[in-house]
Amino acid sequence: MKMRLWKSVLKYAGAVIFFLVVAYGFVPQVLGGKIVNQSDISGYVGMAQEANSWDREHPDDKTAWTNSMFGGMPTTMITGNSKGDLTQKIYNAFLFGKRPAPYLFISLVGAFLLMLSLGVNWILAIGGAIAVTFCSYNLQIIQVGHNTKMMALAWLPWALAALIFTYKSALKKDAGWKTWLSLSTLGAALFGMAVNFQIKANHIQITYYLAIIIFCYVIGLFIWLIIDAERRKTIGRFFAASFLLLFLGLAGIGSNANKLIPTYEYSRHTMRGGSELSADGADGDKKTKGLDLDYATAWSYGWEELPNLMIPNYNGGSSSGGVNPDKSHTINTLRQYGQGNLKDVAKSLPMYWGPQPFTAGPMYMGAVTVFLFLLGLFLCKGMQRWWLLAATLIAVFLGVGRHFMPFTEFWYYNMPFYSKFRTVSMALVILQFTLPMLGFYALDRILKGKYTAEQFRIPACIALALTAGFCLLLVIFPGIAGDFASSSDSQMPGELVNALREDRRMLLSNDALMSMIMVLITWFLIFWACSKPKSSDDAKAASRSRIAAISICIVLSLNMFTIGKRYLNADHFVRPREFNGQFAQRPVDKMILEDPELGYRTVDLSVNIFNDSHPSYWHRNIGGYSPVKLQRYQDLIDRHLGGEINTLIKKINSAGTMTALMEDFPSLPVMSMLNTKYIILGGDSAPIINPQAMGQAWFVDNAVFAASAEEEIGLLDDIDLSTTAVFGPDSGADEAGIPARNPEAIDIQNDVIYMTSYAPNELHYHYEASSDRLAVFSEIFYPSDWKMSIDGQETGPEIWRADWTLRSAVLPAGSHDIKMRFEPRSYSLSSNISMASSALLLLLLLASAGLFYFTSRKSR
């Protein structure tokens, strides 16, 4: 008994060590001190610099607001809130090591456990783990820096494994109530912890897809139980296990309340919450709830590119794909044109010719995995086939988005939270789990002798024809895939377009041949294992099955690693010094930072203003990059800032000299109300100073009340914002409370207001007013959580929204000091919920482990 236990321990410990070797072996550059040159992490470093610097210097007063992007915004989706969560340190411990190797390791172990929960042999479970982890999409998102998404995907199989383990323990035949209850409680506690970690990764869209998979499994299991009289006897256990999973799952969710509640509160005011403005600029009750449907479905997988689940270059692969420079028609053509650096050019060519705007690569699931999935679909009976097929079909229908609008619109308008998500093609990540789950479940049953060669033969031939047969057709007749033309080809010379099409054709044929060979080898190995003579003894049969299992895992691994290296390889790694060099202070940054004035902002015309956060590293920036910026600021960009910037650029280009520009400086009312003082043209040239910048705050003499949101934002162009404030119907302003200007007051021209101290979460001003005055602050308005006090009093004037997106308040006469501080109420409430939930989760996990230990000892 003990010997068998030790063998099991060594076997599974060996698998974990193997996964560690694989994780670091795939990215050996990290052992040499290199890091992945991730574009999204570059963006994060820029946007988070102000908040992170402040938090390091003020650990007891961490900021929940930054002014580094879009004039100012909460840090909810940048740095977040981890206060109160007792499991955060455990989560961080799993990430110990040289990233991204820990991401791969966590995914490998989780997928291994998932395969084991299905009853798959441990050798095949290793292959299944590799199939799940090394899907090309995972490597693409690591390369660009979608680390939160990768971590959410890495923890997803842990949650599924715990879920399946819990139900299987509860429904186990002949198990006494103490045994099944202790096992189910332990499984539910592990499920709660896995859900906790999966949500903690902070990618709610992936969590949403996890919920879809769980829903399909639970409904499938319930139907499977009730359709059979014998199985219906265990329905009570099903509900007991479901209650445990629900309770501990909620504890796992509650542990992340410190992130979820602020995120929910913030999302209502962002692009995910919708706009008050109509698309055509007309008045009316046309406020959208969530993202615009066209925007949300812009990245929709085409029906015609679904074969790249099995053939990576079916639609060209990547919008910046690589080719062999010695065999490429495109490179030969460019060589004739005298193009230099051809080896570098060959690494990044527009090879993709599918329906999406652009893409980093295909959702390649593996030719072997797709073949095994189809084999399982035709061979397996019972629940596993149907619930996995249901989850797969839902994922495909969601992933194709605008190409299946009835289904997409139903989800968009009826399913909770779905309208908050973009990039609908992401739903295909569900296939990263459902395809290997059914495929390796089927393979395991075949190699365990659950099916005879006769039972296997017809389903295997059908699966072979659909995969290897389809690949063979593409090798012989690649033109059946299409004309190899991309919408971007029209911008290129005809000769170059023809060369690109030939390269795309070649890439397709090569990958189709590769996939065909992989499938044929897999089919042969399975057929060989199933075709053992009847006279064979059990030992020889087991040996044959083991050889087939190991061989298939090796074939799959070689295929997944080879394709994976297209999207994450040595070229994507750099030294930390090289990565940080992109944030080096430029001469123009140094010139601007020498200005002692507080509160000014910049706009950098040398970058993509609203899609680049590098300038935010050094400055309070009116640009930046965020898919969850405040919706009112996005409205400001769409209706005013974009146009003003275009006008400014045209004027700069036509002026010729700085003197001519300043003599005929364009009107920039919205940029000026944002106190955009410096206009950056390039890193080495002096910035332009905006003579119209309105300063940190100013008193206004008049107020205009708009009847609608459309009128409110339209008035910003029509009035003098330095003397008049614009209030909308929901601005919170009290028209009767606004002081009337006294035309006889001779001291009004001496009234003054200015900033005296700046911190991202706390602003101080001093003002002198001869009478009660309405002041406008060049700071972005955010409902509720910014509070104002005067002269140290606990309460102060109410902050109103003015000029579409700025703050304003009525200030009493006299000489006074103002403090404006950002303290989100959701942070303190959510931190308390997180602490209570995480404490409960840890206690229940320990208690369930103890219960299982004592129950198992007594049973022995």
Question: What are the functions of these language-model segments?
Answer:
Residues 3, 130, 144-154, 166-170, ...:
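Contiguous transmembrane helix-bundle modules in multi-pass membrane proteins
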Residues 19-108, 130-142, 146-154, 286-365, ...:
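Membrane-interface coil-to-helix junctions
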Residues 49-81, 85, 302, 314, ...:
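Extracytoplasmic/lumenal acceptor-recognition loop(s) of multi-pass membrane glycoenzymes
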Residues 11-49, 248-261, 394-397, 471-472, ...:
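Transmembrane signal-anchor helices characteristic of membrane glycosylation enzymes that use polyprenol
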Residues 102-119, 369-372, 438:
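Transmembrane-helix motifs of polytopic, lipid-linked glycan transferases
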Residues 4, 371, 397, 677, ...:
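Active-site-proximal, structured, solvent-exposed surfaces of multi-pass membrane proteins
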